[in-house]
């Protein structure tokens, strides 16, 4: 009998009833909510006369609609209604939360790990497609729809069909200037946005082992852009060191670690699909089109038109085959989002811009992903470095990742963005998004166009 993967072990721990291959009822350990996908679910509970079954396993955040200049100046009526309704709902149903304006406020996929609620072995859901972020800790974590949010509220369970398993092994040692964002963008560019459909992706290999937890979260975050709603990594000493001392970790932390160590994949675990990628061959990545697979490394020209999707993307972006990333005339820079707004991301960008000025006629903003990150960054002077360089230093929130709050890219303007999606109109009507690492975004802010960060002395 073959061994089990970490996913197998966690799945088996959480099955309540049902046969494999059919929908199985799964127990949910942690339910994260935010203001956009929860209002209808709460109303469904009221209409049925139900309560939240386990408010102690539910945690709320305010992030998508929150302004980042004056966080309480919410002028859009729908955004304000969603914020106000979540504030009412968490009180009515007795749910702990990182309230709007509190010292814990931030993006849901940052607040969970920061508070220690995200832990190895847990089954985690949230009404948000980037919930796979939490899989970096050795948890099953994925996004759900609003009707499923209501089901979890009412029962603390969810019906799911077990997905197939993919092993994705990152090998080799990267060149300087290559980061985990480049790993995942290169993977998606090579294999497409549908490769992971129907699979849980287990990321493994020496290149993963060397990453910090913040870098690992970046990779798991974009599992959904690879087509998989779940990404997972084996917990290790890096995981435990990150978690130790955080607010919500188990009181007997050493005993918890002893259990977590049993959850890693067995050497003889079997997978339905295996992909290997050598990161030593990677160059800095930039997207040119309107989905995350439309990307190239800095050394490679944009591809020829292969189909109608390419033709439409080139038309929307105002680009053409044969151009290169350095030819893009940038007008905006966005460093933020649940993909790349952690302290290490801001430190990396600050090293590059320190003592310099952003290019004229360019707008550049930095949005820490949470208030703890903002405080930590200010404590070591990162805010001053960015402001001296001409960046706007904002309050935490989802910000310019999506056009759901005041932070939008103007129509027709190209933006270098550390976020996760480059769809048409994602950052605002007519916005032209180019996904990249924090290093590439910071360097582009200074030059006004993309440059090869491998050549910069500030880059390690």
Swiss-Prot record:
Lineage top rank: taxon: Bacteria
Pathway: Amino-acid biosynthesis; L-leucine biosynthesis; L-leucine from 3-methyl-2-oxobutanoate: step 2/4
Entry binding sites for [4Fe-4S] cluster: 338, 398, 401
Family matches, as PROSITE patterns: ACONITASE_1, ACONITASE_2
Keywords assigned: 4Fe-4S, Amino-acid biosynthesis, Branched-chain amino acid biosynthesis, Iron, Iron-sulfur, Leucine biosynthesis, Lyase, Metal-binding
GO biological process, one term: L-leucine biosynthetic process
Gene3D superfamilies found in the cross-reference section: Aconitase, domain 3
Keyword Glycosyltransferase: no
UniProt catalytic activity: (2R,3S)-3-isopropylmalate = (2S)-2-isopropylmalate
GO molecular function, one term: 4 iron, 4 sulfur cluster binding
Cofactor(s) named in the record: [4Fe-4S] cluster
Signal sequence region: none
Bound cofactor: record note: Binds 1 [4Fe-4S] cluster per subunit.
Annotated EC: 4.2.1.33
Family: Belongs to the aconitase/IPM isomerase family. LeuC type 1 subfamily.
PANTHER family noted in UniProt: 3-ISOPROPYLMALATE DEHYDRATASE (PTHR43822:SF9), HOMOACONITASE, MITOCHONDRIAL-RELATED (PTHR43822)
Subunit-level organization: Heterodimer of LeuC and LeuD.
Role this protein plays: Catalyzes the isomerization between 2-isopropylmalate and 3-isopropylmalate, via the formation of 2-isopropylmaleate.
Name under which the protein is recorded: 3-isopropylmalate dehydratase large subunit
Species name: Streptococcus thermophilus (strain CNRZ 1066)
Name of the gene this protein is made from: leuC
